[in-house]
């Protein structure tokens, strides 16, 4: 896609990968890329259904988890988190590839136990899950996440 656009919007991790050539699809570095401004932080969150007994990353094991639709920011970040924790989709009881507009309803309807979401705060989809059906944002403060943030300048911790 190099040269096809004059202006675009991207998440900081994908901008970093495009500039440095570190994307998973092995695209060459594009060092003419420039950042104009940062719109707002988009912390990655995992929202767990009330009654699912999910409190942290370890308790996702064996659960029904939406990892995001292919090509989405939440899917990309979820894959990075799985790799950092040394697991793949087999770690979960089942995975789904719902879009961000589908996942809150699926959580409240008990079709999934949790979903990951890379989004600015506040967000209506997260509010639908937390206010509408008692879901909660789980703690992602693990050693693997601490190392991931320390090793990657485009990630930062956020408190919600």
Predicted regions and their residues:
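Phenylalanine-focused residue identity feature
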Residues: 7, 19, 37, 44, ...
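Pocket-lining segment of extracytoplasmic ligand-binding domains
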Residues: 12-14, 22-23, 89-160
